[in-house]
């Protein structure tokens, strides 16, 4: 039976300001990418989200991003590679410490927002970020945007990794994500997202906006926890996959 992981970005609330319905998502997904305080989140939110993930049997991932709370980590920043390594080391270190404190562990790491998008087209930048993570935990699983420079970087490093596709984002023909500023870049319709993911999993490929198939290993499917229909999309994707004979389960370390 085909198996695939279902992940979501979360832990992005800050103080009294709430973003996303993490409690509901954690009952549907199998992996959680938890913000590390730079683009979103705070220590209390991180601790609570990790504890809830562990309670629900959901695999925990560190989700480092640029230091940009106001821009939610979605604005490009020019950062030297040495600083990028330290940026990732710092955030992963915090995640590992918090996970241990609440009685669980971090299994994987996934870059956030603009940092991830920039690394999807710049292999040297991706390598710097991932080397920073491996310096802290050589056994960490790196979650990468499949078929992009991120995947090339982890293949070069020879580390553990899984390939990710998106349930709620449209694709360019090179495997990168369509710019959020463009119409149709973000998918909000659960009735579209679920069947679309089943089609890609069965094809073993990313299907771009032009209809091009980019063959890849579909190890995990992501949806953004901050979207207005995130919970509905998660339910739709999981239901469509399971009805289509796909087992939704966490990937193995």
UniProtKB/Swiss-Prot annotation:
Recall the GO molecular function terms of this protein's record. 5-oxoprolinase (ATP-hydrolyzing) activity; ATP binding
Query: Which Pfam families does this chain map to?
Result: LamB_YcsF
E.C. numbers: 3.5.2.9
Family annotation (InterPro entries) = Glyco_hydro/deAcase_b/a-brl, LamB/YcsF/PxpA-like
Q: Does the keyword Manganese apply?
A: no
Tell me one GO biological process term.
carbohydrate metabolic process
What are the entry keywords? ATP-binding, Hydrolase, Nucleotide-binding
Q: Which chemical reaction does it catalyze?
A: 5-oxo-L-proline + ATP + 2 H2O = L-glutamate + ADP + phosphate + H(+)
Matching NCBIfam families:
PRK05406.1-3 (NF003814), PRK05406.1-5 (NF003816)
Annotated family: Belongs to the LamB/PxpA family.
Assembly and partners?
Forms a complex composed of PxpA, PxpB and PxpC.
User: HAMAP family of this UniProt entry?
Assistant: PxpA
Please give the function described in this protein's UniProt entry. Answer: Catalyzes the cleavage of 5-oxoproline to form L-glutamate coupled to the hydrolysis of ATP to ADP and inorganic phosphate.
Q: What is this protein called?
A: 5-oxoprolinase subunit A
* Annotated source species: Ruegeria pomeroyi (strain ATCC 700808 / DSM 15171 / DSS-3)
Q: Top-down, what is the taxonomic lineage of the species of origin? A: Bacteria, Pseudomonadati, Pseudomonadota, Alphaproteobacteria, Rhodobacterales
Give the gene that encodes this protein.
pxpA
């Amino acid at each position: 039976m085909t198996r695939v992981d279902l992940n979501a970005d979360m832990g992005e609330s800050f103080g009294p300001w709430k973003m996303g319905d993490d409690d509901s998502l954690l009952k549907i997904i199998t992996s959680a990418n938890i913000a590390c305080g730079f683009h979103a989140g705070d220590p209390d939110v991180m601790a609570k989200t990790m504890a809830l993930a562990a309670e629900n049997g959901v695999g925990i991932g560190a989700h480092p991003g640029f230091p940009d709370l106001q821009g939610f980590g979605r604005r490009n920043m020019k950062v030297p590679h040495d600083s990028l390594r330290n940026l990732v080391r710092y955030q992963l270190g915090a995640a590992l410490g918090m996970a241990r404190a609440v009685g669980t562990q971090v299994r994987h790491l996934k870059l956030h927002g603009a940092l991830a998008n920039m690394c999807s087209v710049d292999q040297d930048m991706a390598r710097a970020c991932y080397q920073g993570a491996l310096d802290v935990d050589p056994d960490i699983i790196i979650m990468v945007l499949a078929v992009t420079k991120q995947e090339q970087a982890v293949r070069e490093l020879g580390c553990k990794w899984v390939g990710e596709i998106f349930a709620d984002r449209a694709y360019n023909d090179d495997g990168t994500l369509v710019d959020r500023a463009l119409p149709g870049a973000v998918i909000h319709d659960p009735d579209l997202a679920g069947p679309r993911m089943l089609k890609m999993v069965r094809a073993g490929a990313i299907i771009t906006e032009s209809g091009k198939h980019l063959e890849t290993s579909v190890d995990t499917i992501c949806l953004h926890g901050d979207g207005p229909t995130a919970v509905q999309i998660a339910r739709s994707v999981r239901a469509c996959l399971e009805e289509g004979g796909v087992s939704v389960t966490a990937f193995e370390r």
